[in-house]
Structures are given as C-alpha cells and as structure tokens.
C-alpha cells in the first residue's frame, strides 16, 4: 500500500467521524492539504459525483484520480451497494442471553477445582500421621 492511499483512508475516517457526530457541514469539513500547495487532498465530490455512491458520500482525492465512497452505517462495497449482514451488526453489541451463559459454567469449574483440592488435602492428612499422635498413650 502506498502512503498516499493510507493518508486517503485516514482522512476519510476523520471526515466520517465529523459527519456522524452531526457537527459537520460541507463547508466546515477539515481539509488535509499538501505542504507545497493549498489545494485540498480530499474533498467531497461535486455535481459529477451525484448518484455515484448508493448509500454514502462521494469523496474525490487529488493524488489518486477517481471518486471513492464513504459508506453510511450498515452498508459496504465500492459504491456502498451491499448491506452489512444483520449477524455482523449484532456482534457489535453483546447479546444479554449469550453473555450470561458462561457464568454458570465458570462457577461449576471453580467449585470442582475447590472440591478436588479439599479431597486431596483430606486424603493426604489421613495417610500421614503426625509425630504428636504417636506420643499420646491412651
């Protein structure tokens, strides 16, 4: 991957975060500029990009000739044409029924380990006699 492509992806993520927060207006989006010129490296597409992205915003990069899409939540693809599967979206939020299932299993394993330890201590103390017990005469 070239450095310019990585910069394009990073800038698209920054622009997306501003747009998702509801604070961004097209004229107030941050512009990443090259040190030698004042032409923005990434800008929103003009009228030529209308309808290019099916479910998202069109971005035009100066260094990479072409239009790219910044997809809305729930969509993916080159032109944001694919819907993200429901199972994938569900996996972002923990499901309450599946998050409590491991709890009884963990408790049972811990109880089993404690019982094994107590049983081994009991057997060990039963087999060995302390010297004090030999000295006591009935």
UniProtKB/Swiss-Prot annotation:
Tell me, in one coarse class, where this protein mainly resides.
secreted
| Glycosylation (residues) | 34, 95
Question: Which cysteines are cross-linked by disulfides?
Answer: 45-58, 53-69, 71-80
Query: Which keywords, in A-to-Z order, does the entry hold?
Result: Disulfide bond, Early protein, EGF-like domain, Glycoprotein, Growth factor, Secreted, Signal
Q: Which domain of life is it from?
A: Viruses
An annotated GO cellular component of this protein is: extracellular region
Q: What stretches pass through the bilayer?
A: none
Segments forming domain EGF-like: 41-81
Q: Which GO-annotated molecular functions does the record name?
A: epidermal growth factor receptor binding; growth factor activity
Q: What upregulates it?
A: Expressed in the early phase of the viral replicative cycle.
Matches recorded under InterPro entries:
EGF-like_dom, GF_C11R
Q: Where is the signal peptide?
A: 1-19
GO biological process: one example: positive regulation of cell population proliferation
Compartments reported by the entry: Secreted
Instruction: Give a short account of what the protein does.
Output: Stimulates cellular proliferation (hyperplasia)and mobility around infected cells to promote rapid and efficient spread of infection.
What protein family is recorded? Belongs to the orthopoxvirus OPG019 family.
What's the protein called, per UniProt? Growth factor
């Amino acid at each position: 991957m070239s450095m310019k492509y990585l910069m394009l992806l990073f800038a698209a993520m920054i622009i997306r975060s501003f747009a998702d927060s509801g604070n961004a207006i097209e004229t107030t989006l941050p512009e990443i500029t090259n040190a030698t010129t004042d032409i923005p490296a990434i800008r929103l597409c003009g009228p030529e990009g209308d309808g290019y992205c099916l479910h998202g915003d069109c971005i035009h990069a100066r260094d990479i000739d072409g239009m790219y899409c910044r997809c809305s939540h729930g969509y993916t693809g080159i032109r944001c044409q694919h819907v993200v599967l429901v199972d994938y979206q569900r996996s972002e939020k923990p499901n309450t029924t599946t998050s409590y299932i491991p709890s009884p299993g963990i408790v049972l394993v811990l109880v089993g380990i404690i019982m094994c330890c107590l049983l081994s201590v009991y057997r060990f103390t039963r087999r060995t006699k302390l010297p004090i017990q030999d000295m006591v005469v009935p």
